[in-house]
């Protein structure tokens, strides 16, 4: 009885349908000015029907980290310079791919902050809205009433924004409209669940998007992951031995001492040896050679070889 009451209260707070117990639901709870610093606390709520009743998971979003600069996200110098140039283009499509929790949303928000100015109209379609940013017009999806990513995109195209963010491309309809938006003078940002950058091309093809439309609309694809950061308080460094220096230099453009986590850690990292996370990125700008490969319907392995020849650093 207590669980049923608690679940009903949680659904009300997250603006979910308390009568719907057969389908998964996603919502959001916001506590305004939760602490003395006036920081808002944002919770993403997900419910699902399970064999012994409904289950709920709440994900705490760090509002203080909503405006991290691109320089703090772990981009290499080469990738950072390239990415900054790509996001400032007037039209095209930039896709971020990776599993859930790989930092895609954070990178997208940071990119929008980088290019945001009063002279640009930026619209976002999100499910749910993770962070509220100044200067952006953000739309919360409500699939129960038919407000989907595809419906939001159609609406945006009639309102002539400069930049569009779509939380995720989930189906063929959304993918088709996203491509059309990129081809009609808009810069579109979105995400896909694929393992690496070249694999995104295959995913779009599976969604029945014509190869020539993919190559014409895509600006770049960025695959990413989050790795644990060695604790700065107790971490140690060692010099590269043997061919380690050569291998690291060639693979990830790294030279110098190699950081190591201390076994047992320290109080600062709670005995783990790691504190915080840092992103790694696989940036694949669409070159003329890749355009030919996409139009020629090359497989993922061949597209990856072309991208590596064009100086893409793989994950």
Model-flagged regions — what are they?
Residues 1-315:
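Short, flexible helix-loop junctions that flank or precede catalytic/ligand sites
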């Amino acid at each position: 009885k207590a669980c049923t009451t608690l679940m009903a209260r949680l659904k009300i707070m997250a603006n979910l349908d308390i009568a719907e117990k057969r389908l998964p639901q996603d919502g959001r709870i916001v506590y305004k000015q939760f602490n003395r610093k006036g920081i808002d606390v944002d919770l993403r709520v997900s419910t699902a029907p399970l064999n012994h009743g409904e289950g709920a998971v709440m994900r705490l979003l760090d509002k203080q980290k909503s405006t991290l600069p691109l320089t703090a996200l772990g981009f290499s110098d080469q990738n950072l310079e390239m990415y900054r140039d790509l996001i400032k283009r007037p039209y095209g499509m930039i896709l971020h791919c990776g599993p859930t929790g790989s930092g895609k949303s954070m990178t997208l928000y940071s990119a929008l902050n980088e290019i945001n100015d009063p002279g640009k109209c930026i619209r976002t379609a999100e499910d749910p809205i993770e962070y509220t940013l100044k200067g952006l017009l953000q739309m919360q999806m409500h699939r129960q009433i038919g407000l989907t990513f595809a419906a939001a995109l159609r609406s945006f195209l009639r309102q002539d924004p400069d930049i569009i963010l779509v939380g995720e491309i989930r189906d063929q309809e959304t993918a088709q409209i996203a491509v059309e938006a990129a081809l009609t003078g808009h810069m579109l940002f979105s995400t896909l669940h694929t393992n690496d950058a070249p694999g995104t091309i295959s995913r779009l093809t599976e969604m029945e998007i014509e190869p020539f439309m993919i190559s014409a609309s895509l600006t770049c694809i960025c695959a990413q992951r989050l790795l644990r950061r060695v604790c700065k308080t107790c971490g140690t460094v060692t010099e590269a031995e043997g061919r380690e220096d050569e291998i690291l230099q060639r693979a990830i453009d790294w030279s110098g001492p190699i950081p190591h986590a201390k076994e047992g850690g320290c109080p600062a990292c709670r005995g783990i040896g790691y504190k915080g996370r840092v992103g790694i990125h696989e940036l694949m700008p669409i070159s003329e050679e890749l355009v030919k490969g996409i139009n020629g319907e090359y497989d993922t392995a061949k597209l990856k070889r072309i991208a590596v020849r064009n100086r893409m650093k793989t994950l």
